[in-house]
């Protein structure tokens, strides 16, 4: 059996193990004793290390911040840094996000590509090297982090308590290797002139704000003007309602990862762009026509700030 045939023969086993990880809701939770990122990430780490144990690897849990599976010998360590925590799920799933679902040649579930699936791919690659007797002059250490999505405190802890890595990569992007990434800016914007009464949209900073609801004061024929303006945008859905002297604007754009904003439509950005000509309703730093990645998680009407 050649290596490609052997990889294929392991696919069912790997998918079964992926299902075990996908079934765990490993979003950032409430810290508890011995569980710095809450119950879910700790449970996912326990299961990930258990799978590695079953495959015959040495495993170590570093205080539920992260853990690792290791093979090989030598003083130098090649690190493979993945993560088991996930971003919030949202409400528009076709399939159960916590159940691995197969549809043709695709599988669906939260974490299948970011980053539970890639962790297992790396683990099974290590298994194949070991089982084929490949002798390495370095150790290979697969690190399973629990906080990549919300600050990478898992890796900060690793650097404090574990051996330094000689080199490494993360299976959390496209192949071939990417040597650098775009930067991010997290900020709070204040405005003296905004007339926004409330604004909510988005659920995580590294994803496009694909839905947004904004409330502003109603004015003569403003509802009709906004409806006409929104009809010419790339929104999937929009609705403007008027009640008790207020306009509620709902917009549904197109979701996309923050690294590929050109593939999505920012609902908050569209509302801002189309409302601005009719009054100083929004003065957020969102790129016009909804191509920016900014998102208003909440709006503080008293302080006039977008958070």
Regions found by a protein language model. Give the residues of each.
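Short secondary-structure junctions
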Residues: 54-62, 102, 196, 237-240
């Amino acid at each position: 059996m050649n290596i490609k045939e052997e990889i294929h023969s392991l696919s069912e086993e790997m998918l079964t193990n992926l299902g075990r990880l996908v079934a765990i809701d490993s979003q950032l939770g409430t810290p508890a004793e011995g569980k710095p990122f809450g119950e879910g990430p700790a449970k996912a780490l326990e299961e990930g290390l258990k799978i590695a144990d079953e495959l015959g690897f040495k495993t170590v849990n570093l205080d539920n911040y992260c853990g690792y599976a290791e093979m090989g010998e030598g003083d130098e360590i090649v690190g493979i840094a993945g993560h088991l925590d996930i971003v919030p799920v949202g409400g528009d799933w076709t399939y159960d996000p916590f159940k691995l679902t197969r549809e043709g040649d695709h599988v669906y579930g939260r974490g299948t590509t970011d980053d539970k699936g890639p962790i297992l791919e790396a683990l099974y690659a290590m298994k194949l090297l070991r089982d084929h007797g490949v002798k390495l002059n370095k150790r290979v250490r697969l690190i399973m982090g629990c906080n990549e999505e919300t600050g990478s405190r898992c890796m900060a802890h690793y650097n404090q308590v574990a051996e330094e890595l000689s080199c490494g990569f993360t299976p959390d992007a496209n192949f071939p290797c990417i040597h650098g990434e775009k930067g991010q800016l997290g900020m709070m914007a204040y405005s003296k002139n905004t007339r926004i009464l409330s604004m909510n949209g988005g659920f995580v900073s590294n994803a496009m704000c694909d839905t947004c609801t904004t409330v502003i004061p109603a004015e003569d024929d403003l509802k009709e003007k906004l409806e006409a303006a929104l009809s010419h945008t790339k929104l999937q859905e929009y609705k403007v309602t008027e009640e008790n002297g207020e306009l509620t604007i709902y917009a549904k754009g197109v979701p996309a990862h923050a690294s590929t904003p050109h593939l999505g439509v920012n609902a908050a950005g569209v509302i801002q762009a189309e409302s601005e000509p009719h009054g100083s309703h929004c003065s957020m730093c969102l790129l016009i026509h909804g191509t920016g990645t900014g998102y208003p998680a909440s709006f503080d009407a008293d302080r006039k700030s977008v958070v």
